[in-house]
Curated annotation (Swiss-Prot):
Intramembrane region coordinates: 1-19
Keyword GTP-binding: yes
Cross-link (Glycyl lysine isopeptide (Lys-Gly) (interchain with G-Cter in ubiquitin)) at residue(s): K141
Protein name as catalogued: ADP-ribosylation factor-like protein 8B
Reactions this protein catalyses: GTP + H2O = GDP + phosphate + H(+)
SUPFAM superfamilies referenced in this protein's UniProt entry, alphabetically: P-loop containing nucleoside triphosphate hydrolases (SSF52540)
GO CC aspect terms: axon cytoplasm; cytolytic granule membrane; cytosol; early endosome membrane; late endosome membrane; lysosome; spindle; synapse
CDD domains hit by this protein: Arl10_like (cd04159)
Subunit structure comment from the entry: Interacts with tubulin. Interacts with BORCS5; recruits ARL8B to lysosomes. Interacts with VPS41; the interaction mediates the recruitment of the HOPS complex to lysosomes. Interacts (GTP-bound form) with PLEKHM2 (via RUN domain); the interaction is required to recruit the motor protein kinesin-1 on lysosomes. Interacts (GTP-bound form) with PLEKHM1 (via RUN domain); the interaction is required for PLEKHM1 localization to lysosomes and for ARL8B function in delivery and degradation of endocytic and autophagic cargo in lysosomes. PLEKHM1 and PLEKHM2 compete for interaction with ARL8B.
UniProt gene name: ARL8B
Organism of derivation: Macaca fascicularis
UniProt-listed Enzyme Commission number(s): 3.6.5.2
Length: 186
């Protein structure tokens, strides 16, 4: 019953107030970026994802918020495009495979190199450690330390440990993005 009332309130609010936000999703290949987009768009997880070639754009509506998501390929040849797609967005979402400890250093370096770009100064960053359902996956505290997130001082930064497969913490991730979008516009 409460869910029905909540949906009705969201629908009623959407008649008078719509919010749009744009974000860019980046991270090394095989971290789960496209899977994340599919899970928030449709609630569906698929094991059969293929790597993104270049970029994909998808619009997802949650309540009265429409999120335009740029999903950028993570292979080395596409990383030079990251900055271009991150300019002017409401938030940058940086995805990490939290279970692949061998790639953490490369992931940290790519994140810090990206955020050092003057054109991206001040854009908030949401760091997501995906695949928390796998053995030996780093938790939030370990991600913050290994990714040296405390060194990032010029912007809002948040970190969550998620699992697209199990849909763990997907809701809190969306809440952060939507809340941040609302607070940035007020």
């Amino acid at each position: 019953m409460l869910a029905l009332i909540s949906r009705l309130l969201d629908w009623f609010r959407s008649l008078f107030w719509k919010e749009e936000m744009e974000l860019t999703l980046v991270g090394l290949q095989y971290s789960g970026k496209t899977t994340f987009v599919n899970v928030i768009a449709s609630g569906q997880f698929s094991e059969d994802m293929i790597p993104t070639v270049g970029f994909n754009m998808r619009k997802v509506t949650k309540g009265n918020v429409t999120i335009k998501i740029w999903d950028i390929g993570g292979q080395p040849r596409y990383r030079s495009m990251w900055e271009r797609y991150c300019r002017g967005v409401n938030a940058i979402v940086y995805m990490i495979d939290a279970a692949d400890r061998e790639k953490i250093e490369a992931s940290r370096n790519e994140l810090h190199n990206l955020l050092d770009k003057p054109q991206l100064q001040g854009i908030p960053v949401l760091v997501l450690g995906n695949k928390r359902d796998l053995p030996n996956a780093l938790d939030e505290k370990q991600l913050i330390e290994k990714m040296n997130l405390s060194a990032i001082q010029d912007r809002e930064i948040c970190c969550y440990s998620i699992s697209c497969k199990e849909k763990d913490n997907i809701d809190i991730t969306l809440q952060w993005l939507i809340q941040y979008s609302k607070s940035r516009r007020s």
